[in-house]
Amino acid sequence: MDDTVLRPLPARLAREVLQAHGRELAAAGPHHPVTLRFSQEEMSQMLGASRQSINRLLKQWERGGAIEVAYRSLTVLDPEALRLLTERDEG
């Protein structure tokens, strides 16, 4: 069994954003915002979570300054903050 499904939703969502859009984030560099196109519904289906749960996390990360949420997209402002979320619950 893939251990990804056992991780908490924040770690899974952060990992998905970073993996799915890693090339764009790497090309932009750590201090340049990157806008990623996807809907919260698409993310919820990929992660097996409710759209509402995804929305709550994205809004929390937005308040913390890691991302900026817009219609069918998000802008990654602080990729390192997302990387830390992926590592937080590793054994």
Where does each model-flagged region fall?
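Polybasic "coupling" helices that flank or enter modular domains
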Residues: 1-46
